[in-house]
């Protein structure tokens, strides 16, 4: 049965989180591993198994080449794929694997199927990246009800129980992206006034700074470049992330990686002390990159720093002391610490899911488009139709004309960005309008219309007012996925889910078979008096059948289950004989006809078929283990 819950998902660069509305409040869902966040990591093992989340992260050092991290940084990149043993995966497919695990864990938590979700994206994601995220959700088998900006979602989690009018600034530094948004809150209305950011700045870059420092120091000391060793590099990455986290609460940490490499003389170890001061000097250029977007967002909103009532920090990277110091320096006030930076976005997404599902009333979300949208006109100029920070959904149109006499076609090239020359912005898509009646240049009237829906997805149309000819395009993101491609990827995702289920079944069948053999041998040894030669021979033959299938690498799971069932049936005979002998002993024991255990006692006249199946009881105990 499908749940009516709409899942709120924070699909992060480093970690993801998910939540639902429960009793009027958003609640984080604990995943299958018992954690409140799930690493956004996917791995493929040598035997073809696919791991997602913590299991994938835990084996990354042993399997660096087939472990994929931070795929979010490549969303919307048409040319990027991951090659695993000759099979190529798009960022949408890898993200869908993470979303599949989230969906499965949520279903286990709720006890029902989950079909619908609200997924968050960085506020500064362009249209391609948003569409790619939506495609990933569909590949994972989710109906994506809404794409919501992460800072907006965080503000919803912050303001759910506060009806006062206030202006907040959300400073969101995640694993791979940085966003800053200014919002006006009040009376259940969440209005984004301005947003800015950097899609290529995040906690991963702080990790990379430590990795660079470690690799340089080690090369200077030992003449070995650890970056050329994939396994050593993975160990550096894990150590860098751990050191960054430790330095948020300590002034100094020791990075100790024994046996990091080897020379002809033997193993070489890595050990360096890193102080917080040194770490902050290594990353000063990174934290400084957050200043300009923050100041620009304030300027675009028409506010000064004194107009901001509260500053909300979002993203695990905001736990770094240098972030707190920089925010106070820019805005002159201490950030709010009542919001969990790892969970706020998922909680806000769940609230938006509650709004869409009718569980939450009196909340209105007014988001904005982060970048200007327009087309290329004569001379390669970028003509804006929708300005950045326009509240969505929205639509705008403008009349254009031809540049040459007797021109019968025009090419409409759609761009997103803030540069004056079209080619310096992001090309989202293009199409051709044909069938324009020949006329002098400047005569035809061609209406170009832009429409942005509530997910920030763009539709563009062009119509020749004279002939009525029209064309339109929905800007596709990522690899430009068609419905057929999404369907194909959904089938592949479902196929992998079936493969995982079949692999689990095979392991369970093997475990059950080995357990049955062990139980059989124990029962034969402990119940010699209850087993005649014929039954012993039958059981031993059944044991041999099971062992033969266990040793046969080509045997199917069905075969293994069949021979195990045959052995279990033979073992039932031992159980029946044990109960029969026990009943007979009780019937003929001391106490006479009316005493305990006598003719009128329990079991005196019972038929063997009335006894509980002994082996079935043993099976249940084994299953519980």
From Swiss-Prot:
Q: Where is the composition biased (Acidic residues)?
A: 523-532, 606-625
InterPro entries associated with the record: ATPase_NBD, Chaperone_DnaK, Heat_shock_70_CS, HSP70_C_sf, HSP70_peptide-bd_sf, Hsp_70_fam
GO molecular function annotations of the record = ATP binding; ATP-dependent protein folding chaperone; unfolded protein binding
- Gene3D superfamilies xrefs: 1.20.1270.10, 3.30.420.40, Actin, Chain A, domain 4, Substrate Binding Domain Of DNAk, Chain A, domain 1
Q: Which UniProt keywords apply?
A: ATP-binding, Chaperone, Nucleotide-binding
Organism domain of life:
Archaea
- Bias category Basic and acidic residues: which stretches? 487-513
- Keyword Nucleotide-binding on this protein? yes
State where composition is biased (Gly residues).
588-601
Where is the stretch described as Disordered? 463-532, 576-625
Which SUPFAM superfamilies does the UniProt entry name for this protein? Actin-like ATPase domain, Heat shock protein 70kD (HSP70), C-terminal subdomain, Heat shock protein 70kD (HSP70), peptide-binding domain
Show the Pfam families listed in the entry: HSP70 (PF00012)
Q: Does the keyword ATP-binding apply?
A: yes
Family label:
Belongs to the heat shock protein 70 family.
Outline what the protein does: Acts as a chaperone.
- Stated name of the protein: Chaperone protein DnaK
């Amino acid at each position: 049965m499908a749940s009516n819950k709409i899942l709120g998902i924070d699909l992060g660069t480093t970690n993801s989180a998910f939540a639902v509305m429960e009793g009027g409040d958003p609640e984080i869902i604990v995943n299958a591993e018992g954690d409140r966040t799930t690493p956004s990591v996917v791995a493929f093992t040598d035997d073809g198994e696919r791991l997602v989340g913590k299991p994938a992260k835990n084996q990354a050092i042993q399997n660096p080449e087939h472990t994929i991290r931070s795929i979010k940084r490549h969303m919307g990149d048409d040319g990027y794929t991951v090659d695993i043993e000759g099979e190529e995966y798009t960022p949408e497919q890898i993200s869908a694997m993470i979303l599949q695990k989230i969906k499965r864990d949520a279903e286990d938590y709720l006890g029902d199927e989950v079909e619908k979700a609200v997924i968050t994206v960085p506020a500064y994601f362009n249209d391609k990246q948003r569409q790619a995220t939506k495609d990933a959700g569909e590949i994972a088998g989710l109906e994506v009800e809404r794409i919501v900006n992460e800072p907006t979602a965080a503000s919803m989690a912050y303001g759910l129980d506060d009806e006062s009018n206030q202006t907040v600034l959300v400073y969101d530094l995640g694993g791979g992206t940085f966003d800053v948004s200014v919002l006006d809150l009040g009376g259940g209305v969440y209005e984004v006034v301005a947003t800015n950011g950097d899609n290529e700045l995040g906690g991963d870059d702080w990790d990379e700074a430590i990795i660079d420092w470690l690799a340089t120091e080690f090369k200077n000391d030992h003449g070995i470049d650890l970056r050329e060793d994939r396994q050593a590099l993975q160990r550096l990455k894990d150590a860098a992330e751990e050191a960054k986290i430790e330095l948020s609460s300590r002034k100094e940490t020791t990075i100790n990686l024994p046996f990091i490499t080897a020379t002809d003389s033997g193993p070489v170890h890595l050990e360096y002390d890193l102080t917080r001061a040194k770490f902050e000097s290594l990353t000063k250029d990174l934290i400084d990159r957050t200043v300009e977007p923050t100041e620009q967002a304030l300027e675009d909103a028409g506010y000064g720093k004194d107009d901001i009532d509260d500053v909300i920090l979002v993203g695990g990277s905001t736990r770094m002391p240098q972030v707190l110091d920089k925010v106070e320096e820019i805005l002159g006030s201490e950030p709010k610490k009542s919001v969990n930076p790892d969970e706020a976005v998922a909680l806000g997404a769940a609230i938006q899911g509650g709004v869409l599902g009718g569980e939450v009333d009196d909340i209105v979300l007014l988001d904005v488009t982060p970048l200007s949208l327009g087309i290329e006109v004569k001379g390669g100029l970028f003509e804006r139709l929708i300005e950045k920070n326009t509240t969505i959904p929205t639509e705008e149109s403008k009349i254009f004309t031809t540049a040459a006499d007797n021109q019968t076609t025009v090419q409409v090239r759609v761009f997103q960005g803030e540069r004056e020359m079209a080619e310096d912005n992001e090309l989202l898509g293009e199409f051709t309008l044909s069938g324009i009646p020949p006329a002098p240049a400047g005569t035809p009237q061609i209406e170009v219309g832009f429409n942005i829906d509530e997910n920030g997805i763009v539709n563009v149309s062009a119509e020749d007012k004279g002939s009525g000819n029209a064309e339109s395009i929905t800007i596709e993101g990522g690899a430009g996925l068609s419905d057929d491609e999404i369907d194909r990827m959904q089938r592949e995702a479902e196929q992998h889910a079936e493969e995982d289920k079949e692999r689990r079944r095979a392991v369970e069948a093997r475990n059950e078979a080995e357990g049955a053999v062990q139980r059989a041998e124990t029962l034969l040894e402990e119940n010699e008096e209850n087993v005649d030669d014929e039954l012993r021979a039958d059981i031993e033959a059944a044991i041999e059948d099971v062992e033969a299938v266990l040793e046969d690498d080509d045997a199917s799971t069905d075969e293994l289950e069949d021979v195990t069932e045959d052995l279990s049936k033979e073992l039932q005979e031992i159980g029946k004989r044990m109960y029969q002998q026990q009943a007979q002993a009780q019937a003929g024991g001391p106490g006479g006809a009316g005493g305990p255990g006598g003719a009128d006692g329990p079991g005196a006249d019972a038929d063997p078929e009335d006894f509980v199946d002994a082996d079935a009881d043993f099976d249940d105990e084994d299953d519980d283990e």
